[in-house]
Amino acid sequence: MDHCGALFLCLCLLTLQNATTETWEELLSYMENMQVSRGRSSVFSSRQLHQLEQMLLNTSFPGYNLTLQTPTIQSLAFKLSCDFSGLSLTSATLKRVPQAGGQHARGQHAMQFPAELTRDACKTRPRELRLICIYFSNTHFFKDENNSSLLNNYVLGAQLSHGHVNNLRDPVNISFWHNQSLEGYTLTCVFWKEGARKQPWGGWSPEGCRTEQPSHSQVLCRCNHLTYFAVLMQLSPALVPAELLAPLTYISLVGCSISIVASLITVLLHFHFRKQSDSLTRIHMNLHASVLLLNIAFLLSPAFAMSPVPGSACTALAAALHYALLSCLTWMAIEGFNLYLLLGRVYNIYIRRYVFKLGVLGWGAPALLVLLSLSVKSSVYGPCTIPVFDSWENGTGFQNMSICWVRSPVVHSVLVMGYGGLTSLFNLVVLAWALWTLRRLRERADAPSVRACHDTVTVLGLTVLLGTTWALAFFSFGVFLLPQLFLFTILNSLYGFFLFLWFCSQRCRSEAEAKAQIEAFSSSQTTQ
């Protein structure tokens, strides 16, 4: 009888082992079928995914964990107890299946679960729990209405048996690595929210997740719940075609060099004729000085961003470049304000120590803004990568070029684009008002056609003086991108040269008027 009982027990164990093996085979077969049927509807995809989750939660396996893997799906299951102290998983330690084209080399990922994970579940059911993780290396099961681009096309999911996990005080950390720098991209940690945005399957949502970027190639997601996670990638700036990089660089180099020489000549001529200068000329010279500083800092910026140069030197040059740009924009606005005083307030425009006060504003305010940015966080300045794509590869490949510039998206949005936008808007309004005022004055003249050429020169000069060409920076999108790149590069790299031409024309005009007054005075004296 004892022998019969032992034999019966052995048969039961063998049967249980065979059933467990069949379950693993069924799971693996099901995962392979999911890859074959991935082109079906989103509703069918959700059913497949939920079925895989239930199979992982209910399957039996010996030991602590179970790992199953196909070329694009990896499933893991872990047995947890209420004394759970945390769990860390990395793609480097997991068994990986070689993929065609070396797709596994795109990047790595990791998940870190806190000890708090099992707290609520153990309060209601203090028994063994099951944690499952499902990793996808494609996005076929998570298509939203925007066809969003995901970092490495990775989707990492996790679920705990016996209820949902939400509002964790110690978040789940999900890390993604890429084999190239991610600068130039807006990266957002998101999770798959079923039924979101009126979609039958769901959509990506950033709720409950915080995005951090510890390095140029890593994204860290801190989320207070469990679900399927990914990182959305969006291009911050419009990508520059690689074949246009060389001509744009050459134009910038030549244009800025010409502007530097022209600005130096203008400043030297000003010091030579300093006794004859007035407040208007001194304001022009401050604008020339800011443009000179801007061009010099801009030409040095790419060289200082290279690796042999210390990072502190690049940070200092980036701050100097930002300061020069803010000073240049401020002096453009001062030119607009001064033009308003000249045309609008014909009488009583004397302001005590006028040029000195403008100098404090033009040079002091930008310095204060830059120092404030540095005091808040010194890393706002440094090497900044500009993404450049290769159109011969259909935009799939990109390379990077670096300059010393503003690295913080907030500082760039507020103190570069916002500051420049307000300055350009103010000067465009002043320019329109000045042209309307000049037209009204010309209508009162006896022979307006005689002044047509002079008015054209005046309009072009005012356009240059007020820096309205810098407004082209806000047209770098869509069909305007390529024309904007060349127009902005040509016009603004030669900005110092155009100011030099304006200075020369104004100088010749003032000398001609002075000569005419002397001749008129001499003729009147002769007549008497």
UniProtKB/Swiss-Prot annotation:
Forms a heterodimer of 2 chains generated by proteolytic processing that remain associated through non-covalent interactions mediated by the GAIN-B domain. In the inactivated receptor, the Stachel sequence (also named stalk) is embedded in the GAIN-B domain, where it adopts a beta-strand conformation. On activation, the Stachel moves into the 7 transmembrane region and adopts a twisted hook-shaped configuration that forms contacts within the receptor, leading to coupling of a G-alpha protein, which activates signaling. Glycans are attached at N58, N65, N146, N147, N173, N179, N394, N400. InterPro entries: GAIN_B, GAIN_dom_sf, GPCR_2-like_7TM, GPCR_2_secretin-like, GPR1/GPR3/GPR5, GPS. Autoproteolytically processed at the GPS region of the GAIN-B domain; this cleavage modulates receptor activity. GO terms for molecular function: G protein-coupled receptor activity. Residues 1-21 form the signal peptide. It holds the Pfam family 7tm_2. One of its GO terms (cellular component) is plasma membrane. SMART domains: GPS. It is found in: Cell membrane. Expressed in immune cells. Primarily found in granulocytes. Found in eosinophils. One of its GO terms (biological process) is cell surface receptor signaling pathway. It is a multi-pass membrane protein. Residues 189-239 are annotated as: GPS. The chain crosses the membrane at residues 246-271, 281-304, 315-340, 354-377, 411-435, 456-477, 482-505. Residues 78-239 form the GAIN-B domain. Residues 228-236 are annotated as: Stachel. The keyword Disulfide bond applies. The Stachel sequence (also named stalk) in the C-terminal part of the extracellular domain (ECD) functions as a tethered agonist. In the inactivated receptor, the Stachel sequence (also named stalk) is embedded in the GAIN-B domain, where it adopts a beta-strand conformation. On activation, the Stachel moves into the 7 transmembrane region and adopts a twisted hook-shaped configuration that forms contacts within the receptor, leading to coupling of a G-alpha protein, which activates signaling. Heterodimer of 2 chains generated by proteolytic processing; the large extracellular N-terminal fragment and the membrane-bound C-terminal fragment predominantly remain associated and non-covalently linked. Orphan adhesion G-protein coupled receptor (aGPCR). Ligand binding causes a conformation change that triggers signaling via guanine nucleotide-binding proteins (G proteins) and modulates the activity of downstream effectors, such as adenylate cyclase. ADGRG5 is specifically coupled to G(s) G proteins and mediates activation of adenylate cyclase activity. This is Adhesion G-protein coupled receptor G5. It comes from Homo sapiens (Human).
